[in-house]
Structures are given as structure tokens and as C-alpha cells.
Amino acid sequence: MTELKPLLIELGTEELPVNALPNLSRAFFEGVLAGLEKRGIVVDHGEAKSLSTPRRLAVLLTAVAVEQPKQYRELFGPYLNTAFDTEGKPTKALEGFAAKCGVNWRTLERIRDTKGERFVHRVVVPGERTDALLPGILTEAIAGMPIPKPMRWGAHEYLFARPVHWLVMLLGQDVVEAEIMGVKAGRISRGHRFLYDKPVSLSDPQNYIDVLQAAYVLVDPAARRARIVAEIEAVARQVGGVARITEDNVAQVVNLVEWPSAVLCSFERVFLEVPQEALIQTMEVNQKFFPVLDSLGKLTEKFIGIANIESNDVAEVAKGYERVIRPRFSDAKFFFNEDLKQGLKAMGERLRTVTYHAKLGTLADKVARVLVLAEAIAPQIGVDPLLARRVALLSKNDLQSRMVNEFPELQGIAGHHYALISGELPEVAMAIEDAYRPRFSGDEIARSPLGKVLGLAERLDTLACGFAVGMKPTGNKDPFGLRRNALGLARTMIESRFDLDLKVLLDQASDWVAFATTIEQERHAQESVKQSKKEAAVKHSVPQVSDEKSARIEELYDFIVERLRGYYADKGIPTTHFNAVAELKPVSLYDFHRRLDAIGRFAALPEAEALAVANKRIRNILRKAEIKIPASVDATLFDQPAESGLLVALEGVITDTRSALDCKNYVSVLTCLARLRPPIDEFFDKVMVNDENLMLRANRLALLQRLGEYLCCVAAIEHLSN
């Protein structure tokens, strides 16, 4: 039995980049494991730990074999027909092989393969010791790390994210001799930079976490996270509030500290006059602080900072944090007051001076297009078109505010506040902010009907614009954010149960974009031909229908639907089900969703697989047909009971499901289709479709064509076939 020992590798550095630390730690851990496994060294993965702090990367394995297993090798020699001469004496080939193996040829074994019998020498090579292999393993692991900006440090030749100051390598209680990046391995680590700034001697890997904790270092990120969250919640409770704790903020702070300690801070209440989103943005994104809210979710004047020390003078630490935040809050208040002086209307007037795209005009032009689309969508979902017009008219005004210029993440949010202050209806103000939802992956869609209308109109215009000017996404490039806009559009339609004709909306959006590009061309032409804008508008007021436009609408539709593939995959919907519905190209995405739901239920029926196979067979037969197929079935040409039986069953199902299909009750339709399995099976068992009699053949093909069309009335069910 191979002896197992714990292994510790710790690489000590200057403070590593906070955003890169998780990936560096993961890659370091995986690289060490991969190196051990590559060399056949046994590792117990049960208690394996990837550990890190801003100043160190560590791998802790509880059980690693002290040596490789024995290596069994086979060296293949010559075949018998070349190993001996005609007199049966060994040839130079055999003697040379034996000499290479260091044995007498008579001791060699023989094996037989497809070419005949040959000599083989089997040897057992002792495994190398793990401590001898570890330097190479560590070097490989470091070389494979995703270092964002590798640099040389001092007089050293190595490239790394930060200077390396120490290296601990212990296999059991023994130091592994190695020199990596100019540092010799040992058993000396370092404690906290301020609370325990002295060497820490490690005698055994199994004591690593506890010894460092005694030196004021929580080396396990999970332990630091737990302490941070617990302390923040406790401090917030002390002042009767609730801390706003986001995963992104916690993840950042975890990688900034080795010994976290929560500190309660405060700011002047006058800053609460500023929209709270701006203050929260400043605290979380710029300073990594945690705002404290009241029971209603409103921001209070309290916030919590996480210090990397346990201070004897917490009040002084708090003053430092407050001193840092005050200038930023003062700036936010200044921007807010300046915006109030100019007002929302003045901001909107400046949209004419901002180019949206060289071929698409200004932001004011975009607002005009969105306004028309919003007016068209609103009555279809029960929203007042006048309100839709108003919210569209105001939707981009805040882009010209000082607040959004300083805090781009507040677009829409700032507009909401300024609209309320300007006396707009609450639903109009809310819709300005709401329309931006979903802002990120996993975010909720817009909550208000008016916000949904604006969000749909905005995204339709953006998608049509992007495709019209050739800004389609390629690889990881998506300058217009078309993928995100497409998914936001689709999610809003589906999750709001809006049964809207997507192709009609895309057609309308494309018309207005075509009009915009034409006007822009005329604007440029005015410089040379002095043609008036009014003449250009009259000349081009009716967009021309073209094959190119139709193709673009189809391309846009396919692009949007393709974004749904991942959306449904995340919900566990099989790709085969998605493909079955996508082939029919339903014009309504909510209708797409209902068909997909029905297919999921249909697939669970025992008849589903057989009908899917039958439909695939029908398609193959029709595709290979070499004669013209009649438009209708002639029952007088039937000469087999199975033919008439199938037609009667099909007509019965069509009659029974007509109402359900009109009401889009797809589950009921597909359940009825299951009744067709017996007559379909009998038809294929008893009837020769490609009969020599061409009239019979054509009539049977017509029957199959009608059957195939109805089997696919909800989805192309052949995709369900295994």
C-alpha cells in the first residue's frame, strides 16, 4: 500500500488584483491537481482545498501518494521471421534489441499479434518520488494560470501578476526542495501585514488553516465571506436597519481583506436628498461599502465598511471611510441640483445635438421612431397610446443629465426621479426606469404595462437599427448590445403573455429605420444640392417594400428566436423540443412558448415516439416522391381498408381539434393526435405507398401529405424521434 501524506503549497506575493484573484486561485489549484494526476500520483480529492487571500495562493491536499506507482512497460522487438536467419541463429536485429534491453535474447518473451509472433521485453520501472516531481508540477501550474498582465519584477526573469516573496512546500512534515521564481521553498509563511507582521513556521500541512488564523489570516475565502456577512448583519441590526448585501460586493471585499472587521459609519442626512440609487452606486461600486436601509427599503445615513484590521480606535477608522465618501456624495448632490435647474424638458431639447449613429440620425430621431412604435404596440396590450407617446418622448432625456453622465448605470433611474419632480404622472415616471429591465442576465422584466410597451419599442428599434447598418454581432463583438436586447424583447413578450405578431412589429421598425437612413442620406446631400429636408421627407415618406427588407425581417426573427435557445435550455427544455417548434416559426413568441409547453407534455405520452417516427417516415417518403402529388385525397381510389380507416381517423381528429386549435389549446390538440397512432401503424403495415399503379400511388401520397401537415400543426414532431 502506497504511503499517503498531506501536501501544502503556498505562494506568497504582494496584493494580487482583486478581480483576477478567484480565477488565479482556481487555476493554481486545478493546475496542481492536473500535474499530480498526469504523473499518476494518487490524490484523495475528498478534502482538497483551494485557498487564497490577497497576499497568497494555496493548495491543501489531505492525502497524496509519496511516490508514483510502479510503471509497467513493454519494449517490442523483431518478429520471428527477421529475428533468426535461415540456420536459426539470432540476427543482428534480435541481438541489437537484446543489447538495448540489457538482457540475453534467450530471456526475452514472445507474443503474437495480427502480423505474427515477435519478441518483447517487459520491465518494471520504480515510480519516482512525489517530492522530486513537485517542482515541475508547480512550474506547470503557474505557467497555466490566466495572469491578466504578466510582468517582470526587479532583477528577476520570471513573469507574474505580482512579486513573489515566499514559497511553502510541505509533503507531510518535510520541506520539498525547490526554487520557483527566484524563491526557495521552505516552511515559513507570513501572518497579517499589520496585525502579525512576522514569520509563521508551519510544521504540518494539516495545521495550516489554524496556524494562519492565529496569525490573523483567514486563508479560506468561504470563512472570510461568512464572517463578513455575519458582522455586517449584526452591525446593521444594532442601528435598527438592514444592510444591503449584494453578491458582487461581498465577492469583491472577500478578496480585499485577510482579517475582516465591520465598521459602522455615517454621512450627513442632507445627502439623502439625492436619488438613493446614486448614493448606493457610489458606496458599492466605488468604495465597496455596504449601505444600511430602513424597514421600508429606504436608504439611511448609515453605511458599513470592512476594514482589514481589528483597530483599537474604530471611530478613527470610521472617520477615514466617511472622509472618503463625502466628496463623492458632494459631487452627486451638485450634479443633481444642476439637473434640477435645467429641467427634464431642456435635457430633451439637447438630444437633437447628440448623434445616435452616423447613418441613423440623432438621439432625438431615435426617440421619434420609438414613439411611433410605442403608439402602435400600446393598444394591442391595453395601454393608453397617449401615455405610451408621453413616456417615449421623455425616455431618453436623462441621457443629457449631469447625473447620468457621472453615473451611466442610473439611466432610466434618474429619468424616473426627474419626471416625478417635473410633475409627470407616476406611471409615466416609473415606466422610464422600468423600460430598461431586464438590465442584466437573470434580472426581472419590466413590471408596469407602460414600461413594457416602452421597453419593447426601444428594443425593436435598436435591433432594426443594428441590422440595417450592418452592426450584427460577430463572435464576442456586439457594439449595439443586440443579443441582450433580443433576449430582453423575447422575455418581455413571453413572460408578459403578449400575443403580438413579432414579424409585423419588426416590419414596422424596419420601415422607420429605412426612413431614418434615407433622411440622413438627404441631410448629407443638402450640403451639395441644397435639397430641403421637407422635400426629402415627402419623397421618401412611404418606405419601399423589397426582397432585401423581407430577408432582413426573417434574419431578425431568426436572430431573436435563437436567443431563446439558451433561455429555454437553462429551464431544462430539451433542444429537440425547441427545434420542433422553431421549425414552424410562430410569429408570436408567446405562442412559441405555449407550443413548446404543449410539446413537453405530448412527449411524455406513450404514443409520442411512434408518431414522431411515423412523421419522419412520411417526410422521407414525400421528399423522395417522383410524381406530382394531388392537392386533395380521392376516397374512391382506396382499395385497402387501412387507407379509408386512416382518412376517417384523420378527419375525425381534425374535426375534434378545430376549436382547440383556433383557441391555441395545443395540449388538447396533441393529445387528440395520439389517437392516430393505431390507424397510422395499420396503414404502414398493410399498404404499399409506392404502388405500381400511379393513380393509387399519387392518392396515397396525397393522404400522407395531409396527414403530415396535420401532425405538424403544433410543432414538427419528427424532432422528438430518437
Swiss-Prot record:
Native organism taxonomy: Bacteria, Pseudomonadati, Pseudomonadota, Gammaproteobacteria, Lysobacterales
HAMAP family linked to this entry: Gly_tRNA_synth_beta
Protein name: Glycine--tRNA ligase beta subunit
BP term (GO), one: arginyl-tRNA aminoacylation
Reactions that this protein is recorded to catalyse: tRNA(Gly) + glycine + ATP = glycyl-tRNA(Gly) + AMP + diphosphate
Gene: glyS
InterPro entries: DALR_anticod-bd, Gly-tRNA-synth_bsu, Gly-tRNA-synth_heterodimer
Family per record: Belongs to the class-II aminoacyl-tRNA synthetase family.
GO cellular component, one term: cytosol
Entry-linked PANTHER family: GLYCINE--TRNA LIGASE, CHLOROPLASTIC_MITOCHONDRIAL 2, GLYCYL-TRNA SYNTHETASE
Oligomeric form and interacting partners: Tetramer of two alpha and two beta subunits.
Top-level taxon in the UniProt lineage: Bacteria
EC number: 6.1.1.14
4Fe-4S listed as a keyword: no
Keywords, comma-separated and alphabetical: Aminoacyl-tRNA synthetase, ATP-binding, Cytoplasm, Ligase, Nucleotide-binding, Protein biosynthesis
Database matches in Pfam families: DALR_1, tRNA_synt_2f
Coiled coil: none
Metal-binding recorded as keyword: no
GO molecular function, one term: glycine-tRNA ligase activity
